Design a protein with these regions (language model features):
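Structural preference for beta-strand elements that scaffold enzyme active sites
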Residues: 4-8, 34, 67-74, 99-103
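Alpha-helix-loop-beta-strand connector modules within alpha/beta enzyme cores
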Residues: 48-72, 132-139, 143
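Short, flexible loop/turn segments with low-complexity composition
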Residues: 149-157
Length: 170
């Protein structure tokens, strides 16, 4: 069995908005398979540069394209509650008509990402980030696979969490 190679591009989420839209539409016209935005509170190289927020951009940009797959590269788990992240991904999946790609990551160490200090996000140890990542993946998988989910982990707990509508893709 062979799989086709796909090509995508990570784009800048810097304003102005219309330039971001034009870039995504041009990428789609060029025939690339996916387009991504980084999920950080600020630009990693220069926090003073303007930057729009990834999960607000994704549904807006998905509505401005028709074929290309869309996603965040990657969503760092310290920035979001896993149930809300699953709901955000589900919403983008519907707005994009099934073109959502969910990229997840443990998050960089706070010393490498000014987002933590600037937004008051706790900088977990590497071991804790990895352990939390495992729980987040399990939770999101459960939520997107079942109409009702419960989870009792070391870091996260869900009680009869309902997830409707169902994702368009799986």
């Amino acid at each position: 069995m062979s799989a086709a190679i796909s090509f995508g591009v990570l784009t800048s989420p810097a304003p102005p908005w219309q330039q971001v839209v034009d870039n995504w539409q041009r990428i789609e016209e060029l025939g690339l398979d996916s387009v991504w935005v980084p999920d950080h509170f600020v630009n990693l190289r220069d926090p003073s540069l303007p930057q729009l927020e990834a999960w607000t951009l994704l549904p807006a940009l998905a509505s401005q394209t028709t074929r290309i797959r869309v996603g965040s590269l990657v969503s760092a788990i310290p920035f979001r509650n896993p149930a809300f992240l699953a709901r955000q991904a589900l919403t983008v999946d519907h707005i994009s008509q099934g073109r959502m790609e969910l990229g997840l990551g443990t998050g960089a160490a706070g010393s490498m990402d000014a987002s933590y200090a600037m937004a008051g996000i706790e900088d977990w140890s590497f071991a804790e980030r990895v352990a939390r990542f495992q729980e987040v993946v399990e939770i999101i998988d459960q939520l997107l696979s079942n109409e009702v989910s419960s989870y009792d982990g070391q870091f996260y707990k869900l009680q009869e969490t309902q997830m409707s509508p169902r994702p368009l893709q799986r």
